[in-house]
Amino acid sequence: YGVIRLFIGSDTPGGMVILLAIVGGIFGGMIWALLVGLLKNFGGVNEIFGGLGFNFIADAIMLSLVYGPWKPEGVANGSTKMLESIYWLPQVKGTYLSLWALGIAIVGVVVVTIILKGTYFGLKLKAVGKNNKSSFLLGIPTNRYMLLSFVLCGLFAGLTGALQVTGFNHVLRNNISGGYGYLGLMVGMLANIQPLITAPIAFVFIGLSKGAAGLGMDLKLDSNLSGVIQG
């Protein structure tokens, strides 16, 4: 969102601005994840706790912008001004679905699958994840590979955030992530380093999460049932 704000009112084509916003999101995610990786490697901080800590910092920075310099005049709903449509990824008419965002997600799954299953780098990466000490004894630079894994994860996290702003929400608002990070932890553990099954598992979890609101209205069931099923 911040990258797009830099170009509002300029003559830069909307498509180029969207591309720059996505690249900015990717680099932001990579840097943020690298900080967590450095804490893990050189401070012994568990990646989950380190990630949660940095999430709070990121939320604080975002809130200071949303309620500060990026706040629209006369509005106090914790949301920035809606982006102009030229800065939106194309959507299927009548829906919130962006085929561009969906296509990028599919390409991401394929790329990760190829890296983990079809490259020497991926083999080493999995070895480090399975047994760090044994990998080190075999001559693999474990610290470097651990940091690279964090950077790759940050790349996709930043890409996801950029696509969420340009392809779906079109604003930056409080709690924009909707707890997807915690959902991602469960999906990742269930997938067990199998990228191809990550997408269907994520689809099921998101369906349960989004359908929770309709349980009370349509089926007269407690909306917390979806949380019980996910747990």
Label every PLM stretch briefly.
Residues 2-3, 26-31, 55-63, 101-114, ...:
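Hydrophobic core segments of alpha-helical transmembrane domains in multi-pass membrane transport
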Residues 47, 51-118, 223-225:
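Transmembrane helix-bundle core of multi-pass membrane transporters
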Residues 40-42, 116, 190-191, 218:
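Helix-capping/transition residues at the boundaries of transmembrane alpha-helices
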Residues 95-171, 195-196, 200:
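Helix-loop-helix "hairpin" substructures at the membrane interface of multi-pass membrane proteins
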Residues 1-34, 64:
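Membrane-embedded helix boundary and interhelical linker motif in transport proteins
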Residues 23-25, 151-230:
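Transmembrane alpha-helical segments in multi-pass inner-membrane proteins
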Residues 3-10, 36, 60-68, 212-221:
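Juxtamembrane membrane-interface segments at transmembrane alpha-helix termini
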Residues 5-6, 37-41, 127, 191, ...:
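Transmembrane helix-loop junction
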